[in-house]
């Protein structure tokens, strides 16, 4: 499995996460269609927030990153949020507990 973490902070980040929260159903529908998606999580932090996307393979990660970029460009382009800090890697342990 592969993971990408996209961290938004600085200019426009708080406003971006306000908008993401307001449109979370649309965001979930957009990201839910990613092929091979294992999990997608949006987290608000003090200065903005971050997303964590876990997919079965690199293809899913690439699709998820592209969908996120397109959603932000279409729905939040006027906010002027800085580009996210992106960290990617291979999952070494994964646990789901309900």
Predicted ranges, named:
Residues 1-50, 56-70, 77-98:
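Short S/T/G/P-rich N-terminal loop/turn motif that feeds into the first structured element of a domain
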């Amino acid at each position: 499995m592969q993971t990408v973490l996209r961290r938004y902070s600085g200019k426009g980040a708080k406003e971006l996460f306000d908008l993401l929260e307001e449109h979370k159903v649309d965001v979930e529908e957009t990201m839910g269609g990613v092929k091979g998606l294992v999990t997608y999580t949006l987290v608000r932090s003090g200065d903005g927030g971050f997303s964590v996307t876990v997919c079965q393979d690199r293809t899913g990660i690439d699709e998820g990153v592209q969908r996120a970029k397109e959603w932000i460009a279409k729905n939040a382009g006027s906010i002027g949020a800085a580009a996210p800090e992106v960290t990617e890697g291979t999952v070494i342990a994964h646990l789901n507990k309900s």
